[in-house]
């Protein structure tokens, strides 16, 4: 069974580019254009059980990355989360939220490697 990735990014171009990269190496990807939409997707039990990794942007309208991740954790989701940001100082906003923080930009192979690493951690946690 393939593990789905949930991409949360208000930038359509960035989301589509990352989706194409990840689908190109055999991953299934869902896109949410903001945090609230992602939480709605995850509120469906069938959808939620197939999501194995969340990749989210830091700066988004309506619900910022830290607000989204805090709400995700408050709702009991323990799945791995990667936060992408161009702002090095943003990492401190995620203290205590159990995320992997990565600075943008990075090349496609780095994204693929990161996903493989995070999903590997996920598999070891559930084993």
Question: Where in the sequence are the language-model features?
Answer:
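Hydrophobic/aromatic residues positioned on beta-strands within the core alpha/beta folds
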Residues: 82-85
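Active-site residues of response regulator receiver
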Residues: 57
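Two-component/phosphorelay signaling modules centered on CheY-like receiver
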Residues: 12-31, 99
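Receiver (REC) domain active-site loop signature in two-component systems and cognate sites
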Residues: 60
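Acidic, metal-coordinating helix/loop segments flanking the phosphotransfer/catalytic sites
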Residues: 31-53
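Conserved acidic carboxylate
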Residues: 9
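C-terminal output helix
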Residues: 106-119, 123-124
